[in-house]
Amino acid sequence: DLPSNDGSRNQIVENAKERILKSRPPLLIEKKNIDLISIGNIEDDFYLVKEADWVVEAVVERIDIKHNIYEKIEKVRKEDSIISSNTSTIPLKVLSEKMSDRMKKNFCITHFFNPVRYMGLLEIVTEPVNDKEKIGILKSFCDEKLGKGVIICNDTPGFLGNRVGVYAIQVAMTEAFKMGLTIEEADAVF
């Protein structure tokens, strides 16, 4: 995260880490797993990216900010590390348009559904330039170690999950109107 302007430079993420422990429903399967989370900020600790085998970008959905982060990642990352975005809205082609070919081959979208602990679906969005072996390793890791149901998706608007979800909502609304249901009745049925 960004460094805090007052108090500890990691105050923002320290507070976020505390909120993880207090969240209901719980975000961690076991509270002791909180010790597996290392905190830091983007100014003082960015060099640590070089130690990661997989870097997941999850900043605000603004392409200028994402491109800035990718530029910084590319300068410090391991040559063979996998880089992904957790976006649910921005096309892969747009995210990767300013990347070197070297980084593009190891860049994809890993769209985790929220809340991540409880939602089993993970979409991995790829493009033809991706290193197929790396994508296979990522898919296996997410399936076997994270327990996700992984689907490989094309770079299309809404990917797969959101396209199906929006369609289901449209069908439910259309049927509710046809049946003359109230909002409460429609919510109970659909």
Which role does the model predict for each range below?
Residues 2-83, 90-94, 98-101, 121-122:
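Rossmann-like NAD(P)-binding element
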Residues 11-15, 19, 65, 133-144, ...:
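A non-catalytic, amphipathic alpha-helix used as a structural packing/dimerization or gating element
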Residues 18, 22-25, 75-78, 136, ...:
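Generic secondary-structure signature for well-ordered alpha-helical cores
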Residues 29-32, 106, 133-134, 180-184:
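A short alpha-helix-loop-beta-strand transition element characteristic
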Residues 79-163, 167, 188:
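Rossmann-fold dinucleotide-binding core
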Residues 163, 177-190:
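Acidic, glycine-rich segments within the central catalytic cores of soluble metabolic enzymes
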Residues 167-173:
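Alpha-helical scaffold elements that line and support the substrate/ligand-binding pocket
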